């Protein structure tokens, strides 16, 4: 019986970690006043009939605080990458041979507030994912046969502590990202 309980906790923790990792990847793509490779890495590009992230088509670097450079390995992919960046980021990259430069304009106050609103929306979705994991684990604990009410109560308290830990982690990541977005 205890083994079943431990399995429920392991599974719940694994799923909560996944939710936090997914959240980290999602907010990494949110633009701040500093250039970051995460801004373009996951943008999908049409390449020989399939959608491929830019990071698989070239080397991405940040030579200056407001510039991203993509050294494309296959010259044929350059127009598709340029188009994808225009569409996804609404920016105009400059192309020199197989090198694509993306210069980021400074963020306006209005755009910063917009990004913070988006950050809050993404954060709430992440919290909901963690709470859904808790709900599923709670249902599994309550359905367990052969454990006392006290054991169930302790298990549910432990589950709540686990949930709080991951919600706190999400909140800390959000606060750091918000500070990053709002800094000039």
From Swiss-Prot:
GO terms for molecular function: ribosomal large subunit binding. Transmembrane segments: none annotated. GO terms for biological process: translation; translational termination. InterPro entries: Ribosome_recyc_fac, Ribosome_recyc_fac_dom, RRF_sf. Keywords: Cytoplasm, Protein biosynthesis. Coiled coil: none annotated. It is found in: Cytoplasm. One of its GO terms (cellular component) is cytoplasm. Responsible for the release of ribosomes from messenger RNA at the termination of protein biosynthesis. May increase the efficiency of translation by recycling ribosomes from one round of translation to another. Belongs to the RRF family. This is Ribosome-recycling factor. The gene is frr.
């Amino acid at each position: 019986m205890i083994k079943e309980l431990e399995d429920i906790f392991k599974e719940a923790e694994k799923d909560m970690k996944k939710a936090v990792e997914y959240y980290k990847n999602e907010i990494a793509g949110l633009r701040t006043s500093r250039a970051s490779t995460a801004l373009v890495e996951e943008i999908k590009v049409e390449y020989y009939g399939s959608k491929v992230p830019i990071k698989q088509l070239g080397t991405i670097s940040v030579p200056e605080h407001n510039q991203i450079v993509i050294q494309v390995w296959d010259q044929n992919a350059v127009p598709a990458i340029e188009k994808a960046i225009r569409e996804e980021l609404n920016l105009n990259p400059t192309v020199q041979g197989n090198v694509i430069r993306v210069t980021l304009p400074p963020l306006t106050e209005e755009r910063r507030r917009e990004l913070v609103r988006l950050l809050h929306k993404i954060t709430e979705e992440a919290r909901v994912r963690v709470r859904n994991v808790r709900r599923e684990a709670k249902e599994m604990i309550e359905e367990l046969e052969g454990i006392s009410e006290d054991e169930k109560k302790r298990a549910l308290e432990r589950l709540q502590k686990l949930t709080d830990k991951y919600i706190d982690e999400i909140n800390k990541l959000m606060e750091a990202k918000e500070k990053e977005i709002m800094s000039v």
